Amino acid sequence: MTNIRKSHPLFKIINHSFIDLPAPSNISSWWNFGSLLGVCLMVQILTGLFLAMHYTSDTMTAFSSVTHICRDVNYGWLIRYLHANGASMFFICLFLHVGRGLYYGSYTFLETWNIGIILLFAVMATAFMGYVLPWGQMSFWGATVITNLLSAIPYIGTTLVEWIWGGFSVDKATLTRFFAFHFILPFIIAALAIVHLLFLHETGSNNPTGLNSDADKIPFHPYYTIKDLLGVFMLLLFLMTLVLFFPDLLGDPDNYTPANPLNTPPHIKPEWYFLFAYAILRSIPNKLGGVVALILSILILAFLPFLHTSKQRSLTFRPITQILYWILVANLLILTWIGGQPVEHPFIIIGQLASISYFSIILILMPISGIVEDKMLKWN
């Protein structure tokens, strides 16, 4: 009799995705982040569900309801901080996952890569709306500043912003709709993640060499299930350390002050994972130009497959592009630091230089180095 996991219509899909899936024998720990993102998403949906049971999306009671969760609900503080810091873990895994794709040329899987970019935008939108929900000072002013950027769109801008707000300012209607979207988006993200996986399994995984690995495949289970499990335990250990010892490390103290439309905080800034994009936005003096640069800072990922000039897929054997890659990583860290600094000298010029070098490395220097390396190998 055929094994049920190979014959049952439902189990068969799971079997082909997580058990009998042929995987390259040499994929490193950089390939762990896909499964870790799945774990992060599950943690966020579960903790979010329990938070939603006690949260009220009304401007008068939102802040109090979060306080109530932390003080009166059994383990409410734990659920709240797991959710808040879980978002940070989500973004750490996301950035490492994208960075891995960039380094090893995984962007040549076009469909998988493009769904990934849509996922990145969806997660960023979800995180932004989630940050508004506690209705603290930074929640309110962050929502005001970021939604206001849409007013830079010619002709329809102002109307669009008022339509999103549901009035003439960020108010009750805005909070209610943000809660609704924040609740539904993670389920859309989960569906998109399945599509992401579906496209990946059409081609099979990439590997550190960037070469075809059809000749050397191993079953996903037990090899990579146990490897992923180790990653999951390490992730949870890191998350729990953050939650139990430093719960407010990555948060903003201003968000412990209830939202007040009459009092602007001295420094309006988003959560740490948006700071690099925020720095790029601020480095352009023109409003519309800043918005375009902000969107392009992420959307530039979609151009990567067309900017690939090398005959090699991965950066493993390409030392010049490797150097550029790590300069790009350092550059992003500088942008993250600048995004959290006030708009004054010398931070303005540092941010502008870092923004220029960010786009230059991706659009100009990396494609040139790909051609140069091919020339050095006499492959051209």
Swiss-Prot record:
Its cofactor is heme b. One of its GO terms (molecular function) is ubiquinol-cytochrome-c reductase activity. Binds 2 heme b groups non-covalently. InterPro entries: Cyt_b/b6_C (IPR005798), Cyt_b/b6_C_sf (IPR036150), Cyt_b/b6_N (IPR005797), Cytb/b6-like_sf (IPR027387), Cytochrome_b (IPR030689), Cytochrome_b_C_euk/bac (IPR048260), Cytochrome_b_N_euk/bac (IPR048259), Di-haem_cyt_TM (IPR016174). Heme b b566 binds at H97, H196. Heme b b562 binds at H83, H182. One of its GO terms (cellular component) is mitochondrial inner membrane. Coiled coil: none annotated. It comes from the Eukaryota. It is found in: Mitochondrion inner membrane. The chain crosses the membrane at residues 33-53, 77-98, 113-133, 178-198, 226-246, 288-308, 320-340, 347-367. Pfam families: Cytochrom_B_C, Cytochrome_B. A ubiquinone binds at H201. Keywords: Electron transport, Heme, Iron, Membrane, Metal-binding, Mitochondrion, Mitochondrion inner membrane, Respiratory chain, Transmembrane, Transmembrane helix, Transport, Ubiquinone. It is a multi-pass membrane protein. GO terms for biological process: animal organ regeneration; electron transport coupled proton transport; mitochondrial electron transport, ubiquinol to cytochrome c; response to cadmium ion; response to calcium ion; response to cobalamin; response to copper ion; response to D-galactosamine. Heme 1 (or BL or b562) is low-potential and absorbs at about 562 nm, and heme 2 (or BH or b566) is high-potential and absorbs at about 566 nm. Component of the ubiquinol-cytochrome c reductase complex (complex III or cytochrome b-c1 complex) that is part of the mitochondrial respiratory chain. The b-c1 complex mediates electron transfer from ubiquinol to cytochrome c. Contributes to the generation of a proton gradient across the mitochondrial membrane that is then used for ATP synthesis. The cytochrome bc1 complex contains 11 subunits: 3 respiratory subunits (MT-CYB, CYC1 and UQCRFS1), 2 core proteins (UQCRC1 and UQCRC2) and 6 low-molecular weight proteins (UQCRH/QCR6, UQCRB/QCR7, UQCRQ/QCR8, UQCR10/QCR9, UQCR11/QCR10 and a cleavage product of UQCRFS1). This cytochrome bc1 complex then forms a dimer. Belongs to the cytochrome b family. PANTHER family: CYTOCHROME B. This is Cytochrome b. The lineage of its organism: Eukaryota, Metazoa, Chordata, Craniata, Vertebrata.
